[in-house]
Each structure stands twice: as structure tokens, then as C-alpha cells.
From Swiss-Prot:
SUPFAM superfamilies in the cross-refs: Ribosomal protein L10-like
Protein name per UniProt: Large ribosomal subunit protein uL10
Organism: Prochlorococcus marinus (strain MIT 9313)
GO cellular component, one term: ribonucleoprotein complex
GO molecular function, one term: large ribosomal subunit rRNA binding
Length: 175
């Protein structure tokens, strides 16, 4: 027996809620994946605030209808799709999907949408290759610390150089 109209409307409302919170969406061809593999993907995505939803393209079409930010997603709604909706750690979620695809070798990314722009597979891969927010903050902190150290050494070098010059002048005067 098929889904009732109420259950379909409930699914569409849930999708609208997830899309409202999401920063990025990936569309995966999940054909050939087992339930265990889909559960594995969902588990991997939890750490980076990603959600994997398998739903009919028609229901997703209803969810994005009238929402300009997600309207470009419609061009990817063909075939058997799993939708990865990401909020928060976009790079981490993309890395999780890429690691999953590398491990299973069954799923492929059809495309994605970030800030209303359709992304190619190359652009999605580039996002996955970006360092995490924590790594970037550590790199910036290291750069700032190195700059402060160089300034401190430079400021300290002026009196040290003057002291060495005076010492050398005093020694040459004694001879």
C-alpha cells in the first residue's frame, strides 16, 4: 500500500525544515547500496551535522518548490537519489561522503548545491580538500604568533646591537 497524502505532506515538511537549516546539499546515486552501507554513511555524517535522506524526487521537488535558494537542485532530481543535507561543517561532511564512496566504490556524487550555486564533482572535491575550520584557526594563530616573535626579536635587537657596538668600541679603546 502506498503512502497517504498526510504522510507525504509530513515528509515534504520535514524536508523543508532540513533544507531551511542546511548550508549545502549533495545528491548521490545510491543504487546498489545496502541498508547497512546507508546506515554507515549516516553514522559518518553525524559528526559533521550532515543528514542523509532517501526520498522520492517528486517529494523533494515539492519541498524545494518556491524556495529560490534550492531551486537549482531540481536539475539533479533524476534516478535514484540520496540527499545529503549539511549544516555546519561542510568540509567535514564532504570528506565523510568521499571517504564512504572510496570505501564502498558503489555510490557516486551527481552534484551539489552551495549558496544557490550548482557544484560540479570537481568543485565538490575541492571543498572536501579544504582544511577544517580548526586547522585554519591553528594556522592563523601560528602565523600571528610567528609575527609577534619576529617583532619582539627585532625590538630586542636594537639595544643589543647598540650594546655590542659600545662594547666593541670600549675594547678597541683599551688596546
Amino acid at each position: 500500500m502506498g503512502r497517504t497524502l498526510e504522510s507525504k505532506q509530513q515528509i515534504v515538511e520535514e524536508l523543508k525544515g532540513l533544507l531551511g537549516e542546511a548550508e549545502m546539499a549533495l545528491v548521490l546515486d545510491y543504487q546498489g547500496l545496502s541498508i547497512k552501507e546507508m546506515s554507515d554513511l549516516r553514522t559518518r555524517l553525524q559528526a559533521s551535522n550532515g543528514v542523509c535522506k532517501v526520498t522520492k524526487n517528486t517529494l523533494m521537488r515539492h519541498a524545494i518548490n518556491g524556495n529560490g535558494a534550492w531551486s537549482n537542485l531540481e536539475s539533479l532530481l533524476t534516478g535514484t537519489n540520496a540527499f545529503v543535507l549539511i549544516k555546519g561543517d561542510v568540509g567535514g561532511a564532504v570528506k565523510a561522503v568521499q571517504a564512504f564512496q572510496k570505501d564502498t566504490k558503489k555510490s557516486e556524487t551527481k552534484g551539489g548545491l552551495f549558496e544557490g550555486k550548482l557544484l560540479s564533482q570537481g568543485e565538490i572535491k575541492a571543498i572536501g580538500d579544504l582544511p577544517t575550520k580548526e586547522v585554519l584557526m591553528a594556522q592563523i594563530a601560528g602565523s600571528l604568533n610567528a609575527l609577534a616573535t619576529k617583532v619582539a626579536v627585532g625590538i630586542n635587537e636594537v639595544p643589543s646591537g647598540l650594546a655590542r657596538a659600545l662594547h666593541q668600541h670600549a675594547e678597541s679603546g683599551e688596546s
